[in-house]
């Protein structure tokens, strides 16, 4: 049976996405500005998603100097909430299709897990030939 999303469930899912989007950014002015009208903002996003009229706003461009100079295009906070909503809906579907050696942005598969897997593969393929990581 197919899952039927209701507008009320969409609003609850948007609130959960908002909590994820604001993590580690609670003191940023754009988060506080969004939070001042939280329910109105979430309802506005929910309405536009529900009616298929949602359009992302232009990104903010800035230069980061460290660790190397580069141009960064940052999404507006309301769009980040939608990104988290989309991720929450789809990540399990996609992660099931990834090979075991996919590590980027997957819970429980960080750099330490990747290093352990690499070491295991090296030892298997080198027939225990001396190699130190």
Per-region residue spans from a language model:
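Conserved pre-motif C helix in the palm subdomain of viral-like polymerases
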Residues: 69-99
